Amino acid sequence: KKLSIIFFFFSLLLCNLLAGCGSKDPAPAADHKLRVVVTFNAMKEFTQAVGQDKIHITSLIPDGTEPHDFQPTTKTMQALSKADILIYNSTGMERWVEQATQAAANPKLVIVEASKDTDRISLTEADEIRAHGQYDPHTWLSLSCAQTEVKNIAEALAAADKTNADFYRKNAAEYNQKLQALLAAYQKKFSKLEQKDFVTGHAAFAYLCRDFGLQQQSIEDVFASGEPSAQNLGKLTAYCKEHNVKTIFVEEAVSPKTSE
């Protein structure tokens, strides 16, 4: 129960804090804001924190849509064809990015993989590796990895808009200080807990678990796909009873039916 309360409180804080070629000098004209498209909300929050009023930002994946299930639309292509920069998390998360950017036929589009150089967690299931690549894509859920993503975004904006480069880097540094403070605060809180296991509908929290020494038990796999077998569901039910689990954390974009 204590773990559930602290984890829920942490989730609220994290949501509030995180609420995603051409010429030699690609800097835009003084009256032109960079047109930045991002894939989903975490990328939007990081990018907005860095770019603030110097950029115009558009999200490709609508609110309430499960990012793993998203497929590009005509509207997606239109946004990409007009953008200066695309910021996405990783090829494991947004596997459609390469084909979509090719189809958009925008030779000046700068494509930024925010999770580059993060300390990624390797997948272990052969089926997941074949379908999605070698790594768990949920890097932004680590407050350590998130800081790398913010820095990568800042450097991309600085390269595209040299006039405001210092502005972007300053904002990134200030935002990362907040992330680091949050990381330190919750490492201390979670270190005091005896019960560090929790149950979630979707195995998306390996990075958060690594940050805080937690252990997730999940109903669905890393990519929110497939139905659990009767055997696995039975094991989870028994686990919840044995450990007196009162809460299952389910994402808004994922059906809560199985969790219920």
Predicted regions and their residues:
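Extracytoplasmic metal-acquisition and chelation regions
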Residues: N16, G20-E260
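Positively charged n-region of N-terminal signal peptides that target proteins for export
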Residues: K1-L3
